[in-house]
Amino acid sequence: IREEFGRLDVFVSNAASGVLRPVMELEESHWDWTMNINAKAMLFGAQEAAKLMDKGGKIVGVSSLGSIRYLENYTTVGVSKAAIESITRYLAVELAQKGIAVNTVSGGALDTDALKHFPNREELLDDARKNTPAGRMVEIEDMVKTAMFLISDDSDMIRGQTIIVDGGRSIVM
C-alpha cells in the first residue's frame, strides 16, 4: 500500500466468522477460531493500518446486536463482536493523537450469506420484519451509508463509538 499509494486513509475491518452452538457444546477451537477471525483481525489489522495513516485516517469495525443481546447459539460470535466494540474504544483513545478516528457500526438482522448458516434464519428475519420500529428490516445499504458517514469528514468528532443500525429493534427487544 505504501509503495503504490503512499499512505492509507481508511481501514474497515469486516472479517467475520463463527461457530453457532450452545454454550455447553463449545470447544476451545471454536472460541479461538472466532476470536482470531473477528476480534484479533480488528486489533492487528488496525495496528497495521495506523502505521500507514501518517496524515490521519478512519478505522471502522463491524459488529452485531449479538454483542449486547442474547442470540441463540451466538456465544462465540457475540463475545467476539463485544471485543471489537471494546477494542474500538481503546484504539480511539490511543490513536487520537495521530488524527485517526476509530468507530464501529453494528447491524441488526441482515439477510446476508452469513445469516444462511443460522438454523433459525427465517425466525430471525421474520422477527426483524415484524418488530422493527422503523417499519422495515435493515438493508446492507443502511450499514454502508453509516460506514460511509463514519469515514467522512462529517464524523471527525465521533470517536470510539458503536453506531447501532437496526431501525430501533434493539430498544424494544
Annotate each language-model stretch with its function.
Residues 46, 80, 88:
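Active-site helix of classical SDR
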Residues 22-23, 30-32, 124-128:
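Substrate-binding pocket helix/loop in short-chain dehydrogenase/reductase
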Residues 51, 93-97, 156:
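Alpha-helical segment proximal to the catalytic Tyr-Lys
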Residues 64:
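Residue(s) in the substrate-gating loop at a strand-loop-helix junction
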Residues 132-143, 154:
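A conserved structural motif in NAD(P)-dependent oxidoreductases
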